[in-house]
Amino acid sequence: MYLNMTHLRQLESESIHIIREVVSECENPVMLYSIGKDSSVMLHLALKAFYPAKPSFPLMHIDTTWKFREMISFRDQMASEYGFDLLVHINQDGVDQGISPFKHGSALYTDIMKTEGLKQALSKYKFDAAFGGARRDEEKSRAKERIFSFRSANHGWDPKNQRPELWNLYNTRVNPGENIRVFPLSNWTELDVWQYIYLEQIPIVPLYFAKQRPVVKRNGMLILLDDERLKLQPGEQVQMKPVRFRTLGCYPLTGAIESTAATLPEIIQEMLLTRTSERQGRLIDHDQAGSMEKKKQEGYF
């Protein structure tokens, strides 16, 4: 498969510059590792940025306890293989209250297990900068967010109070207690990510590749039967379908797509033809109008 990769090297260079800028300017950075394709690319870029040395910052995963099992095993494998320090934080208060996406709905569940969990971890370890894998092409609130996204002492984001970013100059100054969310992949597209994964042969979670999987159709989405906690509702039936995931999150809130794309070239070809957003499969984005922006103002990724 022939691909003109010149633009990918430009994106790679920009991302590496951003990662190095944070490490040189911030006192205690961390890389948020959500285990998805974007996190895998970001991890790969971090390794390149400081090669042959190991990056000086740890990885951190906010574990909701509802991730796909394959994601958790892949997370542990990558951390061990590359020798990263891996911090795993769970909002134990939410676990003790029995918060789940089935009982409490996606909005409350996301707020407690993801947003509050992230805020707890950032405060606990006193990180002043956190790398994230968000991209501007994913969603409209992310489209207007700066590469260096400044958060208050309460971790909130004010979209009307963002600093200018001129050329490749970034202002990393923060007051005590504040922090920065930094998005090295801001200017990448979904297609760029897949082409770069193909070019660099970056390992990713097998859930991205199509194969026969047990799914149930719920709320117009194909939900993978990942463990025994997913109870069938009246009228639902488990079906074996050739599916894969364009985006990965908590399995009860992430819809698969029917696909036969089982290799990277096939996925890239599928991306060239698609006319829908990858986040159409994320139930949390459908909570209400502007739900992602509201979540980010409250401290979400």
Swiss-Prot record:
Belongs to the PAPS reductase family. CysD subfamily. Its EC number is 2.7.7.4. It catalyses: sulfate + ATP + H(+) = adenosine 5'-phosphosulfate + diphosphate. Heterodimer composed of CysD, the smaller subunit, and CysN. Keywords: ATP-binding, Nucleotide-binding, Nucleotidyltransferase, Transferase. GO terms for molecular function: ATP binding; sulfate adenylyltransferase (ATP) activity. This is Sulfate adenylyltransferase subunit 2. It comes from the Bacteria. It is an enzyme of class 2 (transferase). Pathway: Sulfur metabolism; hydrogen sulfide biosynthesis; sulfite from sulfate: step 1/3. It comes from Trichlorobacter lovleyi (strain ATCC BAA-1151 / DSM 17278 / SZ). InterPro entries: PAPS_reduct_dom, Rossmann-like_a/b/a_fold, SO4_adenylTrfase_ssu, Sulfate_adenylyltrnsfr_sub2. GO terms for biological process: hydrogen sulfide biosynthetic process; sulfate assimilation. The lineage of its organism: Bacteria, Pseudomonadati, Thermodesulfobacteriota, Desulfuromonadia, Geobacterales. SUPFAM superfamilies: Adenine nucleotide alpha hydrolases-like (SSF52402). With CysN forms the ATP sulfurylase (ATPS) that catalyzes the adenylation of sulfate producing adenosine 5'-phosphosulfate (APS) and diphosphate, the first enzymatic step in sulfur assimilation pathway. APS synthesis involves the formation of a high-energy phosphoric-sulfuric acid anhydride bond driven by GTP hydrolysis by CysN coupled to ATP hydrolysis by CysD.
